[in-house]
């Protein structure tokens, strides 16, 4: 489990069809540890301590390669990194599992006085989980949705600090990003669907009774 608060940025130093090696400031990573890499939960398969930096290697499954942006990474690319949440630590963002729901694309970048607005397109299937002022994970970063662009995607506001300490500082129009919707939205939908099956409650019934 992760929080979407990026701890470090890493750099791709080796890439094969099913493995990736990342250079990072962390030199105490343990084999078997979970790391969020651009929002994708990977398991440390090998850890090496170099000076002044460390490296870790993770395996990339066919599912990961087909459903995330990691397949397109190249040596030299920068990455958002976060270690798994420990009990007792502060939750500064929102819960993220590291399981990507969709790959979106940067549609537009609009400069504002105090930062930038990024418009991101996504598949219509996940838009039902995205609401204004709700939480969303983009490349592993916990962000707040500014608005939903009906049928197309959503926008987020990026302050200068976030741009400086994450890969948002490198993103350009048409770049792809990993998207994870708020897991609570999916749990609520699942709960409602189960209740509908048991109770016979439908959208039409709720409209008739004034609940919607």
Predicted regions and their residues:
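Conserved loop->alpha-helix
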Residues: 1-212
């Amino acid at each position: 489990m992760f929080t979407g608060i990026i701890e470090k940025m890493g750099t791709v130093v080796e890439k094969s069809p099913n493995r990736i090696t990342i250079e990072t400031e962390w030199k105490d990573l343990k084999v078997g540890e979970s790391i969020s890499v651009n929002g994708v939960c990977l398991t440390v398969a090998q850890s090496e301590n170099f000076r002044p930096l460390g490296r870790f290697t993770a395996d990339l499954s066919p599912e990961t390669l087909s459903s995330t942006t990691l397949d397109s990474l190249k040596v030299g690319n920068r990455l958002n990194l976060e270690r798994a949440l420990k009990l007792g630590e502060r939750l500064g963002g929102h819960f993220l599992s590291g399981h990507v729901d969709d790959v979106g694309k940067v549609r537009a970048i609009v400069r504002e006085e105090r930062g930038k607005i990024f418009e991101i397109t996504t598949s219509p299937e996940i838009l039902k989980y995205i609401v204004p002022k709700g939480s969303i994970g983009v490349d592993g970063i916990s962000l707040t949705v500014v608005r939903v662009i009906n049928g197309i995607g959503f926008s987020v506001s990026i302050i200068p600090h976030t741009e400086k300490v994450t890969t948002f500082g490198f993103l350009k129009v048409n770049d792809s990003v990993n998207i994870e919707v708020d897991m609570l939205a999916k749990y609520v939908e699942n709960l409602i669907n189960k209740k509908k099956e048991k109770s016979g409650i439908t959208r039409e019934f709720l409209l008739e009774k004034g609940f919607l």
